[in-house]
Curated annotation (Swiss-Prot):
GO terms for molecular function: ketol-acid reductoisomerase activity; magnesium ion binding; NADP binding. NADP(+) binds at residues 26-29, 49, 52, 54, 84-87, 135. Keywords: Amino-acid biosynthesis, Branched-chain amino acid biosynthesis, Magnesium, Metal-binding, NADP, Oxidoreductase. Mg(2+) 1 binds at residues 192, 196. Substrate binds at residue 253. It catalyses: (2R)-2,3-dihydroxy-3-methylbutanoate + NADP(+) = (2S)-2-acetolactate + NADPH + H(+); (2R,3R)-2,3-dihydroxy-3-methylpentanoate + NADP(+) = (S)-2-ethyl-2-hydroxy-3-oxobutanoate + NADPH + H(+). This is Ketol-acid reductoisomerase (NADP(+)). GO terms for cellular component: cytosol. Involved in the biosynthesis of branched-chain amino acids (BCAA). Catalyzes an alkyl-migration followed by a ketol-acid reduction of (S)-2-acetolactate (S2AL) to yield (R)-2,3-dihydroxy-isovalerate. In the isomerase reaction, S2AL is rearranged via a Mg-dependent methyl migration to produce 3-hydroxy-3-methyl-2-ketobutyrate (HMKB). In the reductase reaction, this 2-ketoacid undergoes a metal-dependent reduction by NADPH to yield (R)-2,3-dihydroxy-isovalerate. PROSITE patterns: KARI_C, KARI_N. The lineage of its organism: Bacteria, Thermotogati, Deinococcota, Deinococci, Deinococcales. The active site is at residue 109. The keyword Amino-acid biosynthesis applies. Pathway: Amino-acid biosynthesis; L-isoleucine biosynthesis; L-isoleucine from 2-oxobutanoate: step 2/4; Amino-acid biosynthesis; L-valine biosynthesis; L-valine from pyruvate: step 2/4. It comes from Deinococcus radiodurans (strain ATCC 13939 / DSM 20539 / JCM 16871 / CCUG 27074 / LMG 4051 / NBRC 15346 / NCIMB 9279 / VKM B-1422 / R1).
Length: 336
């Protein structure tokens, strides 16, 4: 049975009328949520820590800014959109003391609730709304009059209206224009982490890096290797995004399609899939969450080491030089 998609026509936004929504943070997702909700006619306040460099940006966008504590006190719905590793401490210090009965606590990702790092009181609603794309794109498609697909979930329904509130929120940021699916905190967290690690981030970047290194080590020009293993990825992914695998294969040459069939299984083997299952197991057991939290609490020594190593890789240096010569690439839209 196909999963049900919810659209604008399925949502009654009256549940959020005359309510105040606090967006905690003003990063990639938060700036888009705040501006989209405001432009949809909802009352919004942005909660930021004292001295936050984001205050000027939020105010420049025409948004009211308050401390996290004051925003939580005032608001009926509190959406926590700061980095996962920062949420528990901010929640305990600045949100929990002011999260009174009848309010709703919302998330863009289920990580901290699912892994027990944030435990909301029983007398508040708890839900998540997660657009399936980066914040700058969420904002762009909204201003273009379109929407971005998303998912929503209810963890706790103290008011009996948590689901309606979640859907109204999803409509406010533009997701129900494209359609939203209902899920659970468990499913959203585990599938999101798996997708990021095995395919979207870990899988893609390491596949590109291995391909680039193979060509360069064989004596080919790094610039040519960059075009063949990294630059053209977007062209293929865009075809898959718009038309699926079949549509993509219809759009490429017979040579490329034949190579796809005979070589793909040599790169992504049964062993690769078996390792993907191990990765999923580490996510489900909480092992990945533990390692992430441990690194975060130590100041991210492992992650900073990896960032430094990747920054010095030839593919990054060559890529920067080539991208600087491509005026059609919009670099500013990635800035928050």
């Amino acid at each position: 049975m196909s999963a049900k998609m919810y659209y604008d026509r399925d949502v009654d936004t009256q549940v959020l009328e005359n309510k105040l929504i606090a967006i905690i943070g003003y990063g990639s997702q938060a700036h888009a949520h705040a501006q989209n909700l405001r432009d949809s006619g909802f009352n919004v306040v942005v909660g930021l820590r004292e001295g936050s460099s984001s205050k000027a940006k939020a105010e420049q966008a025409g948004l009211r800014v308050a401390s996290i504590e004051d925003a939580t006190k005032e608001a009926d719905v509190v959406m926590l959109l700061i980095p996962d590793e920062q949420q528990p401490a901010v929640y305990e210090k600045s949100i929990a003391p002011h999260l009174t009965a009848g309010k709703a606590l919302a998330f863009g990702h289920g990580f901290n609730v699912h892994f027990g790092r944030i435990k909301p009181p029983a007398d508040v609603d708890v839900f998540l709304v997660a657009p399936k794309g980066p914040g700058h794109m969420l904002r762009r498609v909204y201003t273009d009059g379109a929407g971005m697909p998303g998912i929503f979930a209810v963890q706790q329904d103290a008011s009996g209206k948590a689901r309606d509130i979640a859907l109204a929120y999803a409509r406010g940021i533009g997701c129900t224009k494209a359609g939203v699916l209902e899920t659970t905190f468990k499913e959203e967290t585990e599938t999101d982490l798996f997708g990021e690690q095995s395919v979207l981030c870990g899988g893609v970047t390491h596949l590109i890096q291995a391909g680039f290194e193979t060509l360069v080590e064989a004596g080919y020009q790094p610039e040519i290797a960059y075009f063949e293993t990294l630059h053209e990825v977007k062209l293929i992914v865009d075809l898959i995004y718009e038309k699926g695998f079949e549509g993509m294969r219809h759009s490429i040459s017979n040579t490329a399609e034949f190579g796809d069939y005979v070589t793909g299984p040599r790169i992504i083997t049964d062993q690769t899939k078996a390792e993907m299952k191990n990765v999923l197991g580490d996510i489900q057991s909480g092992k990945f969450a533990e390692s992430f939290i441990k690194d975060a609490e130590s100041g991210f020594p492992y992650m900073n080491e990896q960032r430094s190593k990747m920054r010095d890789h030839t593919v990054e240096k060559v890529g920067k030089e080539l991208r600087d010569q491509m005026p059609f690439i919009n670099k500013k839209e990635l800035e928050v």
